[in-house]
């Protein structure tokens, strides 16, 4: 059994109510429950954490390394464009990851076009709403089984 960690960055706790025209009506709990169920169906364990605090996400990445987490799916949200520290934690962990964004960041404000994570990620999925998480989980499981 492999372990996958899903990390959600700032403001994602507001899913379902925050700008639903951009982010959709599904809540973060809906997404996490669906992912956990899909992972369990395949015989894997899925953990998740949402935090508005950069240091909590960094500490969780450090813990993931010590726990032997096999893969990370991360939506760094606003930290995508600002967090060198979280990028460094991802690199230091050595855990492969996929970057996910609910909206198409390339069709939004120019400051959202740059990511500190894309060049070190296994892949990037954006603009597909919560389905992006499902696709990331599918890809993560395929990579784990290689």
UniProtKB/Swiss-Prot annotation:
Gene3D superfamilies: Dehydroquinase, class II
Site location (Transition state stabilizer): 18
Glycoprotein listed as a keyword: no
Pathway where this protein functions: Metabolic intermediate biosynthesis; chorismate biosynthesis; chorismate from D-erythrose 4-phosphate and phosphoenolpyruvate: step 3/7
Entries under CDD domains matching the protein: DHQase_II
Source superkingdom: Bacteria
SUPFAM superfamilies: Type II 3-dehydroquinate dehydratase
Keyword Membrane among UniProt keywords: no
Function: Catalyzes a trans-dehydration via an enolate intermediate.
Family designation: Belongs to the type-II 3-dehydroquinase family.
Assembly notes: Homododecamer.
Protein name according to UniProt: 3-dehydroquinate dehydratase
Organism: Marinobacter nauticus (strain ATCC 700491 / DSM 11845 / VT8) (Marinobacter aquaeolei)
């Amino acid at each position: 059994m492999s372990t996958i960690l899903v990390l959600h960055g700032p403001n994602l706790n507001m899913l379902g109510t925050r700008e639903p025209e951009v982010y959709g009506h599904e809540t973060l709990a809906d997404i996490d429950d669906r992912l956990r169920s899909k992972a369990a169906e395949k015989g894997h364990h899925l953990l998740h954490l949402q935090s508005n605090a950069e240091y909590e996400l960094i500490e969780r990445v450090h813990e993931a390394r010590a726990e032997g987490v096999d893969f990370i799916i991360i939506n760094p949200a606003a930290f995508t464009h600002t967090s060198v520290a979280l990028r460094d934690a991802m690199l230091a962990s050595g855990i492969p990851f996929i970057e996910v964004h609910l909206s198409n960041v390339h069709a939004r404000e120019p400051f959202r076009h740059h990511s500190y994570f894309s060049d070190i990620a296994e892949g990037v999925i954006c603009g597909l709403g919560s389905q992006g998480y499902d696709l990331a989980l599918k890809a993560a499981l395929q990579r784990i089984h290689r």
